[in-house]
Amino acid sequence: MASKEMFEDTVEERVINEEYKIWKKNTPFLYDLVMTHALQWPSLTVQWLPEVTKPEGKDYALHWLVLGTHTSDEQNHLVVARVHIPNDDAQFDASHCDSDKGEFGGFGSVTGKIECEIKINHEGEVNRARYMPQNPHIIATKTPSSDVLVFDYTKHPAKPDPSGECNPDLRLRGHQKEGYGLSWNSNLSGHLLSASDDHTVCLWDINAGPKEGKIVDAKAIFTGHSAVVEDVAWHLLHESLFGSVADDQKLMIWDTRSNTTSKPSHLVDAHTAEVNCLSFNPYSEFILATGSADKTVALWDLRNLKLKLHTFESHKDEIFQVHWSPHNETILASSGTDRRLNVWDLSKIGEEQSAEDAEDGPPELLFIHGGHTAKISDFSWNPNEPWVICSVSEDNIMQIWQMAENIYNDEESDVTASELEGQGS
């Protein structure tokens, strides 16, 4: 039996390597930018910071990323990394390759430089790290323990204390177990939600300050789910609304003004397997998406949750991340275990296709990023550079990429997400 499994693993590895070679050969035609960087340790989390600096007389801009480490028994860190991204007029040259560093893709005379600027000691791996929108120096992290940690990275030395001691600015209590979901309220400064394997969602207000030492207790604990809560997200336009998704296959919508924390305002059986992630559309107040172990992304309208608006099908395995583009109302991306990051365009739903095109996927599947050879752990849309995405995978690889303009500029469609709201699937 073991030898059969080994044989299957070898075959799969060979297929993955073959696919990667084909992908790499085609990058000049598919991308305007590709930077591949091998991190010292895999990161389970990635998020662009909102700041960008354009050094005078240079053909690149400086961007920053929040990363974490997932080491094998060595000291873990919360990391802020600096990235050089070329200006539009700098020439991208996909043939530039540095196989020693595991890097390729450059532009002009500048290699895509990525360097760790700040490393802060962390207790165990960083399951997820997210900055506070009102003050991006403040970063919350999910740990392998039940605590959620908060760091102001300006108050920590750039190089970590060799003792390995983790010294967060706040320690948020309320959970019994670890988890992944984490969401700051973009309308109420300091209000943080966290999802946990203990079946609950906790809410903290870090402005309330610690009661003793650095400990802040949860302001509310929401107990509606009957299984591991995988993800949680604040609504982007309503300060009191949030959504949560769980292994009980449910999507729940909560209102913090409600008198009860045990029953959501709305709940729906969202998928036929665990629901792993959700994302509210930044432009349309009623639209959200969920991703699931059933290999689909579902589109929802808050005004009628009984009816699923649309199901996006193309992934071959569990979906763990779904994020709307910050720049385009109809653009959504998803990723997960199948090593693929799919970019979807809602405005193309229902378009006619040739039989040949239909074999590649539905009309709304705009792009498949095939550069990863391991499960994708997280990805983030760059808030300053439209169509630039950073994705990280379990094999230490981080990729910063932008699909070729002719792919998304095909013909600009005028359908908005709000026009799709009335159409059920």
From Swiss-Prot:
Membrane recorded as keyword: no
GO function terms (MF aspect): histone binding; RNA binding
Any Pfam family matching the protein: WD40
Each WD repeat, start to end: 47-122, 128-173, 181-217, 228-269, 275-312, 318-369, 376-403
Positions bearing N6-acetyllysine: K4, K119, K159
UniProt keywords, alphabetically: Acetylation, Chaperone, Chromatin regulator, DNA replication, Isopeptide bond, Nucleus, Phosphoprotein, Repeat, Repressor, Transcription, Transcription regulation, Ubl conjugation, WD repeat
GO biological process: brain development; cellular heat acclimation; chromatin remodeling; DNA replication; negative regulation of cell growth; negative regulation of cell migration; negative regulation of DNA-templated transcription; negative regulation of stem cell population maintenance
Subunit: Binds directly to helix 1 of the histone fold of histone H4, a region that is not accessible when H4 is in chromatin. Subunit of the type B histone acetyltransferase (HAT) complex, composed of RBBP7 and HAT1. Subunit of the core histone deacetylase (HDAC) complex, which is composed of HDAC1, HDAC2, RBBP4 and RBBP7. The core HDAC complex associates with SIN3A, ARID4B/SAP180, SAP18, SAP30, SAP130, SUDS3/SAP45 and possibly ARID4A/RBP1 and ING1 to form the SIN3 HDAC complex.
Cited function: Core histone-binding subunit that may target chromatin remodeling factors, histone acetyltransferases and histone deacetylases to their histone substrates in a manner that is regulated by nucleosomal DNA. Component of several complexes which regulate chromatin metabolism.
Designated name of the protein: Histone-binding protein RBBP7
Species this chain originates from: Mus musculus (Mouse)
Gene coding for it: Rbbp7
